[in-house]
Regions:
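Thiol/disulfide oxidoreductase modules built on the thioredoxin-like
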Residues: 107-115, 120-168
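Short pre-active-site segment immediately N-terminal to redox-active cysteine/selenocysteine motifs
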Residues: 56-59, 63-67, 133
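Bacterial N-terminal signal peptides
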Residues: 8-16
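Hydrophobic beta-strand anchors of alpha/beta hydrolase catalytic cores
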Residues: 60-61, 91, 137
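Structural microenvironment flanking redox-active thiols in thiol-disulfide oxidoreductases
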Residues: 72-112, 123-128
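Bacterial N-terminal signal peptides that target proteins for export
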Residues: 1-8
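N-proximal helix/coil linker or "cap" segments that precede and/or mark the start of modular domains
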Residues: 15-36, 53-55
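A short beta-strand-turn-helix
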Residues: 38-59
C-alpha cells in the first residue's frame, strides 16, 4: 500500500509539472530587479521585500497553493532549510489561490509546522511574470536582483541548503 501511494504521488508530481510548466515564463525574471511589494501575512504583519532585504542577504519568494501536491511535499524541506539559514535568508510563501483564506492558510501552516512568512499573492505577481506553474520559487539578493528561479518542487533539504550555500558564498557576512 505504501509503495502504491508513493507511485501515485510521483505520478501526480510528474503530471502537475508537465502540465503546469508548459506555459510558465518566470525564468525571464532571472537577473532582473524584482518589484518591491508588501503583503499582509497570516500573522497580521506586513511583509515588504525592500524591508526584508535590509536585514537578510536573500529573500525566497515561493508561489504555491494549498491544493498543490508538489508544494505540500516541498514545504517541510524549505522550512528545515530556512531554520538553518534564518539569520541570512528570509522566506515569504504566497498562495495564488483565491479560496486560500487567512483561516485556511493558518490551518495549513499549523498542519505543516511552517513558521516562515505566509501570505496571499493578491497583487498577482506570478501572473505579471507570465507564470502559471506552481511551485515557483524566486530568490532575490540584497540588491533586489533575482538570482535564482525554480519552477517545480525541491524534494530534499539538501537541494535548498546547497542552493543557499552557493548563493551566499560570495556575500560577506555582516556582523
Amino acid at each position: 500500500m505504501k509503495k502504491l501511494t508513493t507511485i501515485a504521488l510521483v505520478l501526480v508530481l510528474v503530471f502537475t509539472l508537465a502540465v503546469s510548466g508548459a506555459h510558465a515564463d518566470p525564468e525571464a525574471m532571472y537577473g532582473k530587479t524584482f518589484p518591491d511589494f508588501t503583503v499582509k501575512t497570516i500573522s497580521g504583519e506586513d511583509f515588504t521585500l525592500s524591508e526584508s532585504l535590509k536585514t537578510h542577504d536573500l529573500v525566497v519568494i515561493n508561489f504555491w497553493a494549498t491544493w498543490c501536491g508538489p508544494c505540500c511535499m516541498e514545504f517541510p524541506y524549505l522550512q528545515e532549510a530556512w531554520e538553518k539559514y534564518a539569520d541570512r535568508v528570509d522566506v515569504i510563501a504566497m498562495s495564488i489561490e483565491r479560496t486560500d483564506t487567512e483561516k485556511v492558510l493558518k490551518s495549513f501552516a499549523k498542519e505543516y509546522g511552517l513558521t516562515f512568512s505566509i501570505g496571499r499573492d493578491e497583487k498577482k505577481l506570478l501572473d505579471k511574470m507570465h507564470g502559471d506553474a506552481i511551485p515557483t520559487t524566486l530568490i532575490v539578493d540584497r540588491t533586489g536582483k533575482v538570482v535564482s528561479v525554480d519552477v517545480g518542487a525541491k524534494m530534499s533539504v539538501e537541494e535548498f541548503t546547497e542552493l543557499f550555500d552557493s548563493l551566499l558564498a560570495d556575500i560577506p557576512v555582516v556582523i
